[in-house]
Amino acid sequence: MRFSELVKSLDRARHYLRDFYLFGYRTREEYEAGRSYDNERRRIESWLGDSMRRTPAPGGRAVSLCLDAADEPRNPLYALWATKSFTRNDILLHFLLLDLLSGGGPLAADEAADALAERWGEVFGAATVRLKLKEYAELGLVEEVDSGRRRRYRLAPLCAEDLDEDLLEAVDFFTEAAPFGQLGARIQDELGRVNALFRFKHDFLVHTLDDAVLLTLLTATGEGRKVVLKLRGRTVSGTPVKALFGLQSGRRYGVLHRGERFTLIRLDRVDSARLGELDPDFEAKRQAFDALLPRLWGASLPYPLREERVRMVLTTEGRRERYVAERLKREGRGGSVTERPDGTIVYERRASDSMEMLPFLRTFTGRILSLRGDNRRMLRRFHDDLRRMEALYSLPGSGAALCSPMPKEGPAAKTTTARSGPMRDAASDDGTRCRAADALFHEAFGRYYVIAARLLERADREGPLTPEAIRRDVARWGFAETSTLLLPPLAEGEWPLFRRGTGRSFIPRLRSVRRPLSTLERRWLAALLEDERMGLFLEPEALRRAKDRLAGVAPLFQASDLCAFDRSRDPDPFRDEEYRSVFRTVLTSLREGRLLWARFTSGHGREVHGNFLPRRLQYSLKDDRFRLLARRADPGRPAWEETINLARIRCAVLGTRYAAAEAAARPPARTEPVVLLLTEERQAMERALLHFASFPCRPQTGPSGERLLHILYDAQDEKELLIRVLAFGPLVRVLGPERFVEMVRRRVREQARLLGHAAPQGGADAKGAV
């Protein structure tokens, strides 16, 4: 069968993409179906190009994906949603119907079929045209018009080009900062927009692979329905009441009410999801879970539910280390924080399962004076893990000796086909398909349709196109193998969108018509308009106009449907008018290429002012904060790089324009990568691979089969990375560089000194204060 980079279903591609991105250790021989592996690897290499890497591994070469989430203008994995396969009739009817319906009044299916034959000589049966119009009505691209007994159709009125520029800038931001960002990517592709203003931190790109499952759950929540989920060979049904996000762990969960209790289902383990019957008790179940939520620490729901106390006392250097108390208030998930005159800090929290708090508690390794709690098993594990860490890092140089060099990208080796075997189909016959989730993956929004639309638009604007111009544009806008697969049907007339002109030119047979926004895209925009961050981009009057334009459109999701349980409790003041004014001034300076004079308070409490050359606005999904990445531009002063928290800027004034070359973003100051040795204990390898996925990572298999992870990071993120490594305790081991190993060693040694290994005594299930 001829290779195609397009697919009918995402089931298999979703599986392989997750493997390549998170578990990039596996070689071809570790997959059951060698031929399927070859095809899917080739497709993903075509979609993602230079991000794919091959590294030597025992038994062959391992394929992995290395993406720097903090440096991507948008999620490269959104390409997955633009790969739906189609037929000649699909693409031809798409453009012919758009042209036909844009030129007059509404048409019935038989009238449209007659017009297609008369105007373009393309003969389609009335039934075929009727099915396509009905399909597009469900997508929201056309509207049904009541006309007596006959159904007539017209184009939906709102197109992407009708949106105001301020709203489109918001789309650039929310494409990464809100769920279902692939819908924003569609709008960007329709207009040829590129996000040049924003970058994102703590962004888990892999989440998009599970968006069809998430949308089915949220649709069921909005309609008060049950769902039927297929999980790795078993079927589960229940009533979804909320979606939980872990912005540090990287995991996403659906909360289902099953029987008499709530169950958390990891979205990445769901093969397929379908809508079930209405649940008359939905609202009562939602309220019951909302009442439980303050008692949870994360994604653990032990039964019977209990409440366990945890009390931790930390040592600091008083005001010099005020940031420790601030971090506890920001990340302590509602726990009480008491600062004492002697510089110690008391943190207290009640949780239904205090074992879940261990990773957070370990991030304060080197500062803990005492740790007490009701759960003796949790306390014993904390002390046991501390002993193990002390043994791991007891000798200077104990880590670096085992450190392997960073894996280098190997040449693209020719892959031969071996075994073959289809992957099990994830579809289930139970329940009803979610049409909204199906509309996420549809050929009308695919890359090939976008390319064809841009070629027609260019021909409208510039006249007949040469083969070289078409080839150049297809290579620019398509995937790696799109030119090979798309050019023949365009040039040879299989898709008669163009006809041969004089010489070698191509003349369009139809007009370029902008595709209307789909129902899903309009609903996504309606949800964004309810977000408090939208006030940063739109003045009140512009926000009112945007809401009027989308009047009657139900938001795709509600804020009450989603809960990021580990998001910072100290976000930027998005509703504050002074903050909004500063944000818009900074945004204008970036957009127009102008210097910025700013006065702000540094993290050490010092007042700073001066001229700055803005580079990017960086948004942290975990901290819910904006930071300005800029360079000092005062004459006679060093031009060092600055990272400024936007909430600390008290005054911002636009300056003069600067040359485009000056605005070019410098590469981040990268340090030698941290190398971790991963273990399988307590699922540590899987947890670590996802936890660190917001950094650019390169997996490697050592000569003895050990799993290594090379983490690349910016110098300014070193303390954060240290904290995140400490959260894993002895379950990961830092092998290098020696400077980073020494930082961990100092923390562990100091912690052992402070506690003196005062571990609790008693049985594994004993409880009591320690």
Model-derived features: positions:
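Core beta-strand-centered patch of the WYL/Sm-like small regulatory domain
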Residues: 30-37, 192-310, 408-428, 556-675, ...
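Well-ordered mid-protein domain cores that form the structural environment of catalytic cofactors
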Residues: 70-130
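Short alpha-helical segments that sit at the start of domains
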Residues: 1-9, 72-98, 429-451
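Short helix-coil junctions and helix-kink-helix linkers
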Residues: 24-34, 114-124, 472-479
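Eukaryotic partner-binding/assembly regions in large regulatory complexes
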Residues: 1-61
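Bulky hydrophobic/aromatic content
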Residues: 13-21, 48, 94-96, 100, ...
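Polybasic (Lys/Arg-rich)
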Residues: 18-22, 26, 190-192, 276-278, ...
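Short amphipathic alpha-helical interaction segments
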Residues: 32-43, 122-135, 483-486
